[in-house]
Curated annotation (Swiss-Prot):
Subcellular location: Secreted; Target cell membrane
Gene3D superfamilies: CD59
Species whose genome carries this gene: Naja atra (Chinese cobra)
Primary subcellular site in the record, as a coarse category: secreted
Swiss-Prot/TrEMBL keywords: Cardiotoxin, Cytolysis, Disulfide bond, Membrane, Secreted, Signal, Target cell membrane, Target membrane, Toxin
UniProt note on tissues of expression: Expressed by the venom gland.
Name assigned to this protein: Cytotoxin 3b
CDD domains associated with the record: TFP_snake_toxin
Length: 81
């Protein structure tokens, strides 16, 4: 009985994420990265002239301001970028 209980505890720890970690897409959305502590936003950067083609994606702590040439879209759920 103790072995079964210990096994269930180990499986629970392995299956559950003990601390919430955000996952953000890399430039190619098939791949993603787990964000380090403090980086709690995903972002997508693209040129204003070509809004359908992202230039960069990843994790960030604060969403940058848009400029005349570059636009940022930020979000805070897994793989939302």
């Amino acid at each position: 009985m103790k072995t079964l209980l210990l096994t269930l505890v180990v499986v629970t720890i392995v299956c559950l994420d003990l601390g919430y970690t955000l996952k953000c897409n890399k430039l190619v959305p098939l791949f993603y990265k787990t964000c380090p502590a403090g980086k709690n936003l995903c972002y997508k950067m693209f040129m204003v002239a070509t809004p359908k083609v992202p230039v960069k994606r990843g994790c960030i702590d604060v969403c940058p301001k848009n400029s005349a040439l570059v636009k940022y879209v930020c979000c805070n759920t897994d793989r939302c970028n």
